[in-house]
Swiss-Prot record:
Protein name from the UniProt record: Glucosamine-6-phosphate deaminase
GO MF entries: glucosamine-6-phosphate deaminase activity; identical protein binding
Keywords attached to this entry: Carbohydrate metabolism, Hydrolase
Enzyme Commission number, as recorded: 3.5.99.6
Top EC class for this record: hydrolase
Pfam family, one: Glucosamine_iso
UniProt-annotated catalytic positions: 67 (proton acceptor), 136 (for ring-opening step), 138 (proton acceptor), 143 (for ring-opening step)
Family, per entry: Belongs to the glucosamine/galactosamine-6-phosphate isomerase family. NagB subfamily.
């Protein structure tokens, strides 16, 4: 893993946007894997700003998001489809039909998972996958204990994850109990991975990630086995790791 240490959230976002922008500029055709949550928000803002400054078109880009809640229609303001439209898709010239998220309203969720996996394969795989991390090490919605061999599947969300995401919903009860997520193997098949880690709440997770122990109990640990991962971590996220390193 190539680890880039930055000062804070803003510097992390700028660096991440610059890296993504470079890949978008340099490729005649590119497939991005995208993430939601608080972590990548300013990366998207910075990416839009770069596109505007440079007159860069996104018409050659297609995207696949990591995950989507089950039971929320696309128009629901808490759906990840809505999140992506508000924060990125509506501000760049990417054709809407080239933006993909799992459909959490599909009549057969199992069928939807298979179709999503096939669509990624038909697109030739993901060139660069943007990732955040849960404090319990989850990536996408792959909670601890998820097999490393998993493909896109339906998950029951851990209570910890529902609580962490409750800040976006009126009450904890409104947070969906299930989601569709790319599997860990799906994520590992991306040619390149960009993991962003910011803030004190992620400090233990970052330290664990750097401990080199690869275990299904900490899903992100598998990233140690991927040949092309860049991690951008800010000072707060790196604080526990830095302390341990100096002991
Ligand atoms: N499914 C998402 C993940 O894709 C995200 O990386 C993670 C961290 O979220 P945040 O960036 O808000 O801390 O939790 C959510 O549950």
């Amino acid at each position: 893993m190539n680890i880039i240490h930055v000062k804070n959230y803003e510097e992390m976002s700028q660096k991440a946007a610059a890296l993504l922008f470079e890949r978008i500029q340099q490729s005649p055709k590119i497939t991005l894997g995208l993430a939601t949550g608080g972590t990548p928000e300013n990366t998207y803002t910075a990416l839009i700003a770069k596109a505007k400054e440079n007159g860069q078109s996104f018409s050659h880009v297609q995207t696949f998001n990591l995950d989507e809640y089950v039971g929320l229609p696309a128009e629901d303001k808490n759906s990840y489809r809505h999140y992506m439209e508000q924060r990125l898709f509506d501000h760049i010239d990417i054709p809407k039909e080239k933006t993909h998220l799992p459909n959490g309203m599909a009549p057969s969720l199992e069928e939807e998972c298979r179709a999503y996996e096939n669509m990624i394969a038909d697109a030739g795989g993901i060139d660069i996958q943007l990732l955040g991390i849960g404090s319990n090490g989850h990536i996408g919605f792959n909670e601890p204990g998820t097999p490393f061999s998993s493909k896109t599947h339906v998950v029951e969300l851990a209570e910890e994850t529902r609580k962490a995401n409750a800040r976006y919903f009126p009450t904890l009860e409104d947070v969906p109990k299930q989601a569709i997520t790319m599997g860990i193997q799906t994520i590992m098949e991306a040619k390149e991975i960009l993991l962003l880690i910011s803030g004190k709440a992620k400090a233990e997770a970052f330290a664990k990630l750097c401990s080199d122990e690869v275990t299904e109990a900490f899903p992100a640990s598998i990233l140690n086995k991927h040949p092309n991962v860049t991690v951008i971590a800010d000072e707060e996220a790196a604080s526990v790791y830095t302390q341990k390193a100096h002991l």
